[in-house]
């Protein structure tokens, strides 16, 4: 199995994704939100690029819609929820459709439409994601959503942890140089949050007093669900 990493949503080459399995990672916080919402019984998540698109879906849909998302880590005016996974509890999301728009994560998802299979991963479900990848048994591209088009340490080290989870299942992994680097960084910094504390995006969230979000997002494998993006929305994968 060949594994490569794309360092941000802006670095996605759509042609490279054709017939590939793609994993989207944005641990702070979009993929943590999506995984949490699906785990708590959300019917589906619709990732969109713009605030206007999200509001149009909510206006025209007959479904029970929750609007969620952020711009520059802050809740969007008129939306129900921000991009905090702690808000997407079973009480609020069970049986409902979440329309989500974020700065980085939903852009990475929508830019990956050419892929054969698109799975959503974070630290909170990495082992479950690794099991699904093993079942698919196909070459893999891990897409880090990044931060405003730039490399993000938090997504990168999460990629390294995901690779480590795969190594615990199978040994026939052929890593690109960047994938080897991510795995090396993780294996030498297994206390991920301590390593990431100096990262730009981490510091931004901490400055907004979102320490509880950070604490939640840096937990490993508390959820055994893998969301899958297909035909414009995200549901629980049956892989």
Curated annotation (Swiss-Prot):
Homology family: Belongs to the ComB family.
Cofactor(s) the protein requires to work: Mg(2+)
EC number: 3.1.3.71
HAMAP family linked to this entry: ComB
Keywords on record: Hydrolase, Magnesium
Native organism taxonomy: Bacteria, Bacillati, Bacillota, Clostridia, Eubacteriales
Enzyme class: hydrolase
Protein name (database record): Probable 2-phosphosulfolactate phosphatase
Annotated catalysed reactions: (2R)-O-phospho-3-sulfolactate + H2O = (2R)-3-sulfolactate + phosphate
A GO term, aspect molecular function: magnesium ion binding
Native source organism of the sequence: Clostridium botulinum (strain Kyoto / Type A2)
Superkingdom, taxonomy of origin: Bacteria
Record Pfam families: 2-ph_phosp
